[in-house]
């Protein structure tokens, strides 16, 4: 059975990395049903989210945080590009869309991460049950909502470029969007018990700068948790060169590097940047994510079914903006490549996988 590996150093090279052990914008309807907790998602029957009970807004909010979620299309109208809707605020800096398809994709990746970690824990670092938790790039808000429901005495804030979060979230959960976490914050330094970030690669120009800002906003002794996926396809029993999977990733890596927000993840650099920002007690775990259910272990097969759904929903989404903006490719060419990559992702004779990286880093009690 594949298992998790805890380590202080980055993982070994790719060959041995898989250890035995994700027009104008019309805003969502304010009366729309909220997204259901990830625990309720079923890989055998993905259905519309059930409505959940709404709550009055929290009164925990600090006046220093800023304006709450703004779903007015006149404020920062989204724009259509290649048939998808992209954010209007800071237009063009982020390569992923913000429409309904993207929101479902983000929730599926949240489920992938939960299943892969073999635990229903949402926070792995030490934390007070009544703490202040900040989620950077919260997307649909699914992690923040799950945390708020699990810890009703906590105060949870999610921030994101796009106002795609539900308005009737739990009373102890607030969202602030549009919000660019690469711009100066007004979130209160030395005031957060945990800061969380999930799948941030592809949205950050300067990780050292972001880590310094995160460090400044944590209370002494508090923790930062980051979850990333290295989307470079790997295979331990054959070369992937010459396959569409390999070609697609290399093109995606190049395009996002040209955009100054690389999707590629480098664990050695991540640990070094965290250390340079002042973090200590840095823990790094890696988990293999099979692209399809080729593995014999039943748990790995379950992870693979979820991840196959997630990655097949992501290939075209990842490709459209980078390949049209930076390579000038026509959409038809992109769709042909996407079809080839999906076919290989479904092929159980290709034992390909990606790597999930999980980091925990602590701000020292005394600097």
UniProtKB/Swiss-Prot annotation:
Keywords: Methyltransferase, Nucleus, S-adenosyl-L-methionine, Sporulation, Transcription, Transcription regulation, Transferase. It is an enzyme of class 2 (transferase). Disruption phenotype: Decreases synthesis of monacolin K. Its main location: nucleus. It catalyses: L-methionyl-[protein] + S-adenosyl-L-methionine = S-methyl-L-methionyl-[protein] + S-adenosyl-L-homocysteine. It is found in: Nucleus. Induction: Alternative splicing of the pre-mRNA occurs in the 5'-untranslated region (5'-UTR). The shorter mRNA is constitutive transcript at all growth stages and different carbon or nitrogen sources, but the glutamate and NaNO(3) as main nitrogen source can up-regulate the longer mRNA form. The longer mRNA is probably not translated. InterPro entries: SAM-dependent_MTases_sf. Gene3D superfamilies: Vaccinia Virus protein VP39. Residues 19-41 have a biased composition (Polar residues). GO terms for molecular function: methyltransferase activity. SUPFAM superfamilies: S-adenosyl-L-methionine-dependent methyltransferases (SSF53335). Its EC number is 2.1.1.-. Coiled coil: none annotated. It comes from the Eukaryota. Residues 47-56, 71-82 have a biased composition (Basic and acidic residues). Residues 1-82 are annotated as: Disordered. One of its GO terms (cellular component) is nucleus. Methyltransferase that performs automethylation. No other methyl-accepting substrate has been identified yet. Component of the velvet transcription factor complex that acts as a global regulator for secondary metabolite gene expression. Controls the expression of the monacolin K gene clusters. Also regulates pigmentation. PANTHER family: METHYLTRANSFERASE, PROTEIN-METHIONINE METHYLTRANSFERASE LAEA. Belongs to the methyltransferase superfamily. LaeA methyltransferase family. Component of the heterotrimeric velvet complex composed of laeA, veA and velB; VeA acting as a bridging protein between laeA and velB. This is Secondary metabolism regulator laeA.
